[in-house]
């Protein structure tokens, strides 16, 4: 009989929600919901995932331009931008033991689609809590780095540069 990966003892899935605040030269915040699926190789999970994020970038500079009688003129404006991103990523998690409380780490690397097209990476460390027969919760403090090729806002303004966030995520494991 064929066994699907979801029926395999080494299969793991995660659903996680989180909040992060941008730090450094960017200010704002991001709410996220994602899912990862893959296999356990001993204490290491290897898989991939997809998510959805709502981001707000406050008082961001942007370049505005227009053609005047004297030629091309431009100026720097400031505005709060918001938009949806869809991160697609590879995911590695380490779980040290299977006790009621276990230290854990995770690394994600991939690509953001949506408002900010570009590379994304995230690293985190936290604790995994055994809540009974099938429920396992993980709380992870994360640092995310995003490098959009061009962040295009709803009104076609462009924002460039690196975004760094610090956050907290809570996951349910199955």
Predicted regions, residues:
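Residues that define the transmembrane beta-barrel architecture of outer-membrane proteins
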Residues: 9-11, 27-31, 82-88, 101-103, ...
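Short glycine/proline- and aromatic-enriched beta-strand/turn motifs that initiate or cap beta-hairpins
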Residues: 4-41, 45, 169, 173
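Predominantly the C-terminal beta-signal and adjacent terminal strand-loop region
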Residues: 53-65, 69-72, 102, 118-174
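Structural signature of outer-membrane beta-barrel channels/translocons
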Residues: 38-42, 93-97, 112-114, 126-132, ...
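Short loop/turn motifs that connect adjacent beta-strands in outer-membrane beta-barrel proteins
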Residues: 5-11, 27, 97-103, 130-137
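Helix-adjacent hinge/juxtasegments
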Residues: 60, 65-110
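Transmembrane beta-barrel strands of outer-membrane/channel proteins
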Residues: 13-21, 35, 48-52, 90, ...
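Extracellular loop and loop/strand-boundary signature of outer-membrane beta-barrel proteins
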Residues: 20-22, 74-79, 108-113, 152-158
């Amino acid at each position: 009989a064929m066994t699907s990966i979801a029926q395999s003892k080494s299969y793991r899935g995660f659903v996680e929600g989180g909040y992060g605040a941008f730090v450094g030269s960017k200010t704002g915040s991001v709410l996220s919901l994602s899912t990862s699926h893959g296999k356990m190789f001993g204490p290491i999970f290897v898989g991939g995932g997809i998510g959805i994020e709502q981001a707000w970038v406050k008082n961001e500079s942007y370049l505005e331009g227009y053609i005047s009688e004297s030629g091309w003129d431009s100026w720097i404006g400031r505005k709060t931008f918001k938009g949806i991103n869809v991160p697609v990523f590879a995911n590695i998690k380490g779980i040290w033991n299977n006790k009621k409380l276990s230290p854990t780490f995770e690394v994600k690397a991939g690509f953001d689609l949506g408002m900010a097209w570009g590379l994304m990476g995230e690293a985190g460390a936290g604790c995994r809590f055994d809540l009974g027969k099938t429920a396992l919760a993980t709380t992870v403090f994360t640092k995310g780095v995003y490098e959009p090729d061009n962040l295009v806002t709803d009104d076609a303004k462009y924002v460039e540069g690196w975004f760094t966030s610090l956050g907290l995520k809570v996951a349910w494991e199955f």
